[in-house]
Structure formats: structure tokens, C-alpha cells
């Protein structure tokens, strides 16, 4: 995953010049786990098994509602952290307990 850190966010982007959150999950899961995911967040939220926030394990997908009809996805890294493509920060690591993310948490899925 480290090769992606610092990559700028670009809606619809799929390369190191700019990537969005769901494309980042496609790339990371393909490279790290040899697992093919669908391209969009709305498709990804249907994959795997729903799990509760308190049962998160490394590699679980975490979904957020970030606005009316807007969804965001990241991958859990353990110790309350997740890896994602942030609109404001690009590809970064954030904490689930930060108020912004805690209040927007939607659901989690185990796909590996």
C-alpha cells in the first residue's frame, strides 16, 4: 500500500497521477490479496460479508456516508486506522475515531 501514500485524489482516477477511493481499493486488493473487487463504492458494498465495527480485522472494507448520495471506502489497517483516498489529503491513513469519520461510519465488509 505504501506506494500509493501521497497520491492525489482524482474522481474517476485509477493511476498514480490521481485515484479515487474505490479505485484505490481495486488496486490494493488486487496487488496485496490477489482479490478482484468491483470498480465503484456502491458495487463494493455488496461484496463479502457484513461485519460489525467492533469486529473489524485488517483487510476489511469500511464504508462511510459522506454526503447526500455520496459514499466513501477505505481498508482497515488495525489499531483504529484505515487507508483511503481522501478528497482533501489524497491517499492517506486516518483514524476511525476522529469525529469526522466516526459520525459518518456506515458499514464494514469482510472480503478476504
Task: Give the ranges of each region predicted by the language model.
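Intrinsically disordered, low-complexity
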Residues: 1-7, 111-112
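Solvent-exposed polar/charged
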Residues: 3, 30-31, 75
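Catalytic cysteine-centered active-site loop
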Residues: 7-58
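Aromatic- and glycine-rich peptidoglycan recognition patches
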Residues: 35, 70, 77-112
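Structural motif
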Residues: 59-60, 80
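Conserved hydrophobic/aromatic beta-strand scaffold that supports enzyme active sites
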Residues: 61, 73-75
